[in-house]
Amino acid sequence: MKNIPAVALLLTLASVNVFGQAAPVVGVADPAPLFTDKDPVLHKNKQAAMHIVIDLLAYGHWNEADKWLTERYIQHNPGFSSGRDTVMKAFGARGGGRPIPTDPKEWSTKIVAVTTQGNDIVCVASVSTRPDPRNPGQTYTTTHFDMWRFVDGKADEHWDEGQINAAPAGGGRGGPAPGGGAPGGAAPGGGRQ
């Protein structure tokens, strides 16, 4: 009889999904203030990060990449090559871009947080919606991040959670994993679904 509470607890725990239901990731209501700072250098770098995330990645204005990326732009995502010209050639061919909403609350990329280290590193976390492999036809949200090191107000180096896909059946090269560094087939440095 002494073990009844322990057995009841064990049976209760066994009936609960081990992974549980994670809270959905949501963006902040107004992301614009996250890209500002009292320090003028950090403010310039946060603004550049905002333009990379919104103008380039979300809305495809790759013709403006030279405003926000250094010429050497070092890419640590294994699915993409380094160099601003390489990025512009690869993603600029997609067209001139879509109109950017003037109200940041209407941006397609939902910003979760912007963090910094010193005044040259800026990290932007955003919502990423992915297909749920456990439940076909359903999705879940997680957090995508892009981190840059800035030099003179331009991104000089980039990191994200990029992964390499397996090679396609029948040969060929693998590419960036879905959502791993370029969710939704977006450009290097992120992209959002």
Residue locations for each model-derived region?
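Positively charged n-region of N-terminal signal peptides that target proteins for export
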Residues: 1-4
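Short, low-complexity N-terminal intrinsically disordered segments enriched in polar/charged residues
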Residues: 21-63, 67, 71, 175-177, ...
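A solvent-exposed, acidic/Ser-Thr-rich amphipathic alpha-helical stretch
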Residues: 62-121
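Generic short beta-strand segments
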Residues: 92, 124-131
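Short beta-strand edge/turn micro-motifs at domain boundaries
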Residues: 143-171
